[in-house]
């Protein structure tokens, strides 16, 4: 069963490419059908779960608390898809392959959820607002030892007392092949200065190195295998008269006509990247 609706809650499974803007219903072509979700062993893959609660006459309040449980052969991580305010979604001269040209709330941020205790066992707490869709991102890395073929998963929504209020099912088809090692070099912006500024820690402090390492590990988990390294700090994106936090890893010293270069911090950066799964 892909979609279920009782008197209170709608449950719809969507493919991972669907992006639902606030006020929009899930599109028919985005809905997950049996056999749609396929993956190789070792592949990171995901589906989306859309929920909408309808206010019941005679019940006070405009929101409902439900608890999400997932059952299947492997565990799925759960994140809430959060909309973020966007003032300029596209530049002039764009083509038609866009979500919207209007400013507003755009689904972008994945907010990881942790299970909480519940009478029926660990579950993810969700608060639903009357008439509004809330989307969850369900993700896994397919284990190398998972048998090929179809694997069934179930979604169960419970109230605070453990009563089932809605459910749905979906399936994953696993290929007998494994995802080969990544050879494409993939990098993303990695702002080491912003990490220092946001977490309010000094550059090169032990706290800063720990934070950088965690972000490197997260980048590697999402396919980044080449990291931008701040050997020097060029004045990029810096206002005239302003200053951007310096994070260059090469210390340069001039003594008369002689120059010396200390690569200690650069070596630590390279070692840290390799320890966290980024080889380049």
Report each predicted region and the residues it spans:
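Contiguous beta-strand segments within globular domains
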Residues: 32-56
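Extended acidic/polar, glycine-enriched regions
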Residues: 50-66, 72-73, 122-183, 209
